[in-house]
């Protein structure tokens, strides 16, 4: 994430917080990104600096005017006018980071060798919420190279309980013992 994305995303969050709109803008920001992801030609158009700023901002007005919070629309226009629309996802990341921080939410990614059944997913989420004392947003990834167990990735921390990690630890210990 660039410094510009941190500053812009943080500024949008500060404004939303001041106006009591953090949840609405968070939701709409995610929806706008999903729309742009689903319309790559439109997304490229908004980022094309050879197209006049007024034309790109007008396209934003036509597509989103009255459908999203005016502060969010103005934020998107500022990105468009400054030629920094490509940083929207980074701005959204910073907004989400600040939102999560203020709402005691922690994002955790769990990687397993096979897909976890829904009961195990809920049990893991409940256990993490108890341990961390925060609301947990848990995402899951399947990676057969884990061989078993679970790898948990939290902000600034990784807890590796995979079979692959254990085998690597045993191999390293054997290698050091043989020397």
Which residues make up each language-model segment?
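Elongated, mostly alpha-helical coiled-coil "stalk/stator" tethers of large membrane protein machines
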Residues: 1-179
